């Protein structure tokens, strides 16, 4: 990790030429002016925690207004199997104020995404701290033939999201080094890696920490609307696995046919030292790979036979709902421990605990966000505003015949636009899910499909949003190789990826929709 972090250290240089270039770009280009407006507008937005606090306050006030208006909504409750009429419940009366105070702790501790993320991060923290993730990415990229290097960099970027944000820190700087070692433009390597890591954030061949996190928020939204339906963390798996292949192809095409030709030959004076995987890391990777194979074999024995340990009445549904997150943790923890022991980065149990503790410490911001988000979601549940909005909205959309695939495509575009201003995937979904998941459900679209559409929109515009949390880091990496690079330059570099990924990924969903293929082990499109 230290080697990779060293790569992103900036050179000392005179900033006058760079500032002039950036200012000229922003003044002379309509696109630059647009980017400037996006940057200014986005910078005026408060922190996501503050946004949730304001939203919670709005729910409290609106609940009182709608309660006083006495607006009823009648709908068919599938759980009760009867027509139900509901009214808004106020939070500004004695009972409501008591609920706000008495439920605050329980709202937080029972918030479904909280436990799933923290448990998974225990394993990820050990794997990252031991150096397993860093060594794996270096081995994957540095051992690739020249003709496949672009595809492998994009693929490695996509796969890195199983370790949450490690790809931003490790792979993006590494992309520049690898491309330069092949005599290619380092900014093209940064762009390819950044596109894979960020624009392909939701795609992967295997399940990562994002899957249970978003599924937990989806289930919270369903519970808040009193909908008797549970989405599994694997609900989008098949589609996201195939998406990985599509995005690698699209990323390769954009890099080699659009971005790199536009960049031209690299004339900078910067040079890089060759990066290698040490002998200790090689031994550690072999041992970690063997341990992962043994763990996978044991896991398959526990789920495949008819009387398998994790099957209840011959079914894996309960395991997929309750037991998958600990398996994800072990998927990282076991090879992480083995790698660390063999490579020498873990000398005792204290080192492993230190790595896990460091991962937990990094989740402090998420814990604060989860607390306020859980209050907002539960206020929606208590006041019935979520149900009122979902039912009335679905009836409106149905009355104008705006349903099915057109609605899903429109939702992808909405999610992509909102992502320009709110960077956190979980924060956005916690805001949008209580409204759109029940609304789509009432229009016979499954929560799996709604969440899938959100993930496409959320991922594809990450790379052109200055508010994305790692955007400043990427700017720093780019400036190391091109002192005249400004914010608009980086976004214009990444815009082709964003547009083509959004179009291509949406087209894949359309084709998938019409073929009727399942989007996951239990992922249908339409409710029966």
Task: Tell me the role of every PLM-derived stretch.
Residues 94-96, 106-114, 141-152, 186-188, ...:
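Membrane-interfacial loop-to-helix junctions in multi-pass transporters
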Residues 33-34, 72-114, 224-232, 302-319, ...:
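Interfacial loop/helix-cap signal at membrane boundaries in integral membrane proteins
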Residues 65-95, 210-214, 307-313, 383-392, ...:
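Interfacial/capping segments of alpha-helical transmembrane domains
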Residues 117-119, 145-176, 181, 367-373, ...:
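Hydrophobic alpha-helical transmembrane segments of multi-pass integral membrane proteins
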Residues 39, 43, 170-266, 453-455, ...:
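Membrane-core helix-loop-helix motifs of multi-pass transport proteins
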Residues 30-31, 132-136, 249-273, 300-311, ...:
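Juxtamembrane interface elements at the cytosolic ends of transmembrane helices
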Residues 45-57, 81-134, 317-387:
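Core transmembrane alpha-helical segments of multi-pass membrane transporters/permeases
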Residues 52-67, 117-125, 156-158, 196-200, ...:
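Hydrophobic core segments of alpha-helical transmembrane domains in multi-pass membrane transport
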